């Protein structure tokens, strides 16, 4: 006989909140292996010690934020509603079943006023990495770096023309010295001093989020984005660096400085790195060789005008410092420009009567120009690494490390969109997401 079940919402029971949380719950594992006590000492200088109302425990506050990043809860109001009804969340925060959950405005005001414009988020991220190192989950020997885009909270059609300073490479000073040395060796006059004022370029600037950048890349959506330049350690896929820029900054611009930052902050002895084709620049190749790092960088076929010879068909003669065209005519050195490129030009008397002129140059005067960077030798040596057996093994792991890290962040941690407006706030989001991913990885491996 079918009977109606009596309501039990008003019944009283004696229960232990610890018994209600499954033994294999992720938050149990995180609580077991991650020490959160450092947060209190880290932020105590941001609080008044002897005045004002009692503050919300900062450790509880950041653990609350971590729950949101671990489970991809984008809204702080929704996060508070989830904590109110989720026993595991309450247990992780040290709250009883009847304890009052902090108000959403308390959470947001602390984030906006107390911790904004501070390095608290960076220090928290660094400490989680250090805890992973103490558990031998990070080697610092092989690093994988890439970038991914986060859609800015901005309408791509709401913009005005603006100006931005050209991004300066980490190796600009070294390049200037190399150019002057190369020109001197070829008997050329020194170039006029570079303007101290960085060159401005015209950009699309969002009226909603001016810090974001309008991104235009092959195979990528167009619009206003931020870029997360992330490095992952090859041992257990622990994220070791997060650097956020606007979406119109090239991947190669901050790379060397971020590599140096990891070596200094965590005392990494980096032996090898795996990078995609966006990092295959002469400056990065030279920088890796100077740091004695085995660089494995993907190759991207250069753009080629249909019907013309490929650049590889022009052979460089190092002994004579000239190029030979497909019919063995010499292209001699002419100059070295400020960007570090040597220019080699053909003799128009040979080109104008050559049967392959139409496949060689469209120059009206019959002059073919081929450029070669002053650090091209470094590029050629680094390029050979990807063809070696160790290089193939290193590059093969990119999809298992940094690419998997981004996929996990986008699929499970709400990483497709920027939650906030402004570079500093988006940087905080990226650091907290990466720290949450690291905590999960540590918990699954070490618990």
Question: Residues of each region from the PLM?
Answer:
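Hydrophobic alpha-helical membrane-insertion signals
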Residues: 1-28
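A general alpha-helix detector
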Residues: 16, 60-66, 106, 127
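Basic, short loop/linker segments at the boundary and entry of helix-turn-helix/winged-helix-like folds
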Residues: 23-66, 378
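N-terminal catalytic cores of NTP/NDP-binding nucleotidyl/phosphoryl-transfer enzymes
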Residues: 59-74, 79
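Anion-binding and metal-coordination hotspots
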Residues: 3-4, 72-85, 95-447
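Short, solvent-exposed coil/turn linker segments
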Residues: 16, 34-38, 94, 161, ...
């Amino acid at each position: 006989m079918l009977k109606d079940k009596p309501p039990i919402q008003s019944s009283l029971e004696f229960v232990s909140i610890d018994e209600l949380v499954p033994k294999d719950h992720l938050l149990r594992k995180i609580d077991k292996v991650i020490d959160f006590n450092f947060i209190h000492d880290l932020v105590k200088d941001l609080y008044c010690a002897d005045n004002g109302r009692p503050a919300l425990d900062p450790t509880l506050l950041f653990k609350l934020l971590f729950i949101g990043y671990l489970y991809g809860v984008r809204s702080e109001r929704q996060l508070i509603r989830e904590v109110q009804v989720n026993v595991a969340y309450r247990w992780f925060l040290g709250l009883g079943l009847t304890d009052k959950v902090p108000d959403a405005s308390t959470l947001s005001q602390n984030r906006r006023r107390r911790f904004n414009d501070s390095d608290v988020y960076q220090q928290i991220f660094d400490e989680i990495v250090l805890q992973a190192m103490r558990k031998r989950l990070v080697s610092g020997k092989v690093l994988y770096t890439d970038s991914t885009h986060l859609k800015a909270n901005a309408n791509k059609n709401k913009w005005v023309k603006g100006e931005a300073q050209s991004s300066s490479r980490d190796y600009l000073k070294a390049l200037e010295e190399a150019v002057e040395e190369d020109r001197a060796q070829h008997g050329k006059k020194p170039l006029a001093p570079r303007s101290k004022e960085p060159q401005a370029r015209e950009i699309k600037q969002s009226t909603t989020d001016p810090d974001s950048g309008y991104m235009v890349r092959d195979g990528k959506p167009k619009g206003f984005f931020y870029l997360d330049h992330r490095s992952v350690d090859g041992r257990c896929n622990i994220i070791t660096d997060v650097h956020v820029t606007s979406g119109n900054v090239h991947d190669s611009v901050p790379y060397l400085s971020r590599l140096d930052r990891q070596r200094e902050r965590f005392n990494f002895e980096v032996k090898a790195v795996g990078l995609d084709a966006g990092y295959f620049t002469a400056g990065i190749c030279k920088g890796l060789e100077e740091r004695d790092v085995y660089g494995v960088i993907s190759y991207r076929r250069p753009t080629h005008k249909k019907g013309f010879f490929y650049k590889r068909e022009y052979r460089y003669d190092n002994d004579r410092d000239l190029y030979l065209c497909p019919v063995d005519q010499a292209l001699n050195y002419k100059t070295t420009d400020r960007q570090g490129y040597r220019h080699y030009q053909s003799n128009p008397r040979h080109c104008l009567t050559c049967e392959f002129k139409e496949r060689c140059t469209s120059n009206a005067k019959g002059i073919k120009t081929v450029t070669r960077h002053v650090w091209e030798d470094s590029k050629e040596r680094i390029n050979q690494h990807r063809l070696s057996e160790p290089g193939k093994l290193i590059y093969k792991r990119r999809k298992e490390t940094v690419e998997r890290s981004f996929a996990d962040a986008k699929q499970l941690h709400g990483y497709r969109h920027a939650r906030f407006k402004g570079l500093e706030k988006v940087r905080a989001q990226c650091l907290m997401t990466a720290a949450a991913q690291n905590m999960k990885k540590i918990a699954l491996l070490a618990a």
